[in-house]
Amino acid sequence: MQMGDTVFMFFCALLVWLMTPGLALFYGGMVKSKNVLSTAMHSFSSIAIVSIVWVLFGYTLAFAPGNSIIGGLEWAGLKGVGFDPGDYSDTIPHSLFMMFQMTFAVLTTAIISGAFAERMRFGAFLLFSVLWASLVYTPVAHWVWGGGWIGQLGALDFAGGNVVHISSGVAGLVLAIVLGKRKDGTASSPHNLIYTFLGGALIWFGWFGFNVGSALTLDGVAMYAFINTNTAAAAGIAGWILVEWIINKKPTMLGAVSGAIAGLVAITPAAGFVTPFASIIIGIIGGAVCFWGVFSLKKKFGYDDALDAFGLHGIGGTWGGIATGLFATTSVNSAGADGLFYGDASLIWKQIVAIAATYVFVFIVTFVIIKIVSLFLPLRATEEEESLGLDLTMHGEKAYQDSM
């Protein structure tokens, strides 16, 4: 065990933990004032629910030795997860690796809530969160990072393009379709863009822990991830704003923040495998394709992805996974692989197989989970509750005295 790496990873885990409250602000600013507390509660309660699931059995199912589909139960209740280095890093405590990975599981579950904002009942969300973290997140994490079949295939996902972003985006799309549109349609008027700006800034800050920490040690790969993360976020702003300026004639603050998130999502699977120049291309295209996902794709198919969980995370994560297959190079990370632009066409096909499998699995299992939840609890607020606002009807409080 090395003290330097331990302190580094401890700090990275705290940064990723901070992303979930940041997400609450980011989402909270984009909803109506009568729904800001209920929206924040989805993110905050994810910390509570998923933390418990992770300690009891989530971590062992994701990372314990098992088969190519799911981990075993030897680390259930964190049995054997102590302060000595574990299987995934020989320089940090096993328990620290567990906590770092827990923050990913928490954030992934919270991201989904953006898709059904302003209409899902809180109790139904809690039950859904338990089941989804257990039955969807843990298998996908095992496939990619825990010794499962995607990792064995040779597909690359440095920090969670598949595990975090595609899985949360696709799950959000399923819930948006099943719950249907909001009572007053899909148009949403953000009630406080300063909240969204501050939340976006916290998310960007936390993302350094998310991507850089995925190196698990403070080395050259970590530094590439650090540079690429910031560069792709900046390029994502440029890509989004450029398209927005051309189409809508005005660049917006919401567009700038959304572009940063799009760039960050897109670089996530590639952060420790590509050059800084590639991160510019990945970020710019990420901003542009997520703009298309948020505006054109959603309009074409008519689903109400309220805060664009699929438009940002599903679309951005998909592009990031494909981009990894194009731009990855062993000159950055010898543990990775060369992509198409560096002479190896096989990686891009491995990336596509991994992405497609994640889409299919997450879509089907999320659909089954939400149908099971509906057998026990009503999923959606009534028209009257939606009209009054979920802050008051679900939680008995208001964020503002005039919040209607």
UniProtKB/Swiss-Prot annotation:
Disulfide bonds: none
Upregulating conditions: The nrgAB operon is activated by TnrA. NrgB is required for full induction of the operon under conditions of ammonium limitation.
Location relative to the cell: Cell membrane
PROSITE patterns linked to this entry: AMMONIUM_TRANSP (PS01219)
Keyword terms of this UniProt record: Ammonia transport, Cell membrane, Membrane, Transmembrane, Transmembrane helix, Transport
GO BP annotation list: ammonium transmembrane transport
Keyword set includes Cell membrane: yes
Effect of deleting the gene: Cells grow poorly at pH 5.5 and not at all at pH 5.0 with ammonium as their sole nitrogen source. They are unable to transport the ammonium analog methylammonium, and thus probably also ammonium. In the absence of nitrogen source, cells lacking this gene do not show degradation of TnrA, which is entirely soluble.
Family affiliation: Belongs to the ammonia transporter channel (TC 1.A.11.2) family.
Record protein name field: Ammonium transporter
